[in-house]
């Protein structure tokens, strides 16, 4: 028996386990690449796997017997993909940290262009601080969490960046904009969360509109 993975390396890998045919099959994988693979990114197996060996137990260094692999009646690569697709991940601390940090980065990136205060975009540090006051980020749907956070930040006095539109003005359009945005000289500003309804109304009423390039607020000054 040999141990191809020492304890130091195991800190940076996750184990994916598939139980089938009354047996156990395991792969040692890099958590960040597994996350990308399972979220639809085209990732080569060589980047996902710490080694392409299929184990009975990664932690003990026990390799799966050839007879156990023959039960699949498939190629080695096909077996590996089945384990990756259908197995469950024994998440390491590194995996949990990576997923949490990735979700946080996605949310910050979404909100950076949607939130202002006093006419200025927030620095990343200020935005993270504001988010921390209203929401505990968890690993999950980044877009959904961003919408929840945005609504909470508005109640704290932050401004939601709107959609700048040139539109053929009518009584119905004017009424909608008054309730869900602002009328300016030559264009209207629609709240971003109300824009889907604005678009539907224009299409239904056959009103032409054009989304204009947004005048970017200045970035927050860092002193």
Swiss-Prot record:
Superkingdom assignment: Eukaryota
Intrachain disulfide bonds: none
Keywords (A to Z) from UniProt: Cytoplasm, Ribosome biogenesis
Localization annotation: Cytoplasm
Any one of the GO BP annotations: ribosome biogenesis
Entry-linked InterPro entries: Ribosome_mat_SBDS_N_sf (IPR036786), Sdo1/SBDS-like (IPR039100), SDO1/SBDS_N (IPR019783)
One GO cellular component, as annotated: cytoplasm
The protein's assembly and partners: Associates with the 60S ribosomal subunit.
Family (UniProt): Belongs to the SDO1/SBDS family.
Name recorded for this polypeptide: Ribosome maturation protein SDO1
Protein source organism: Encephalitozoon cuniculi (strain GB-M1) (Microsporidian parasite)
Gene: SDO1
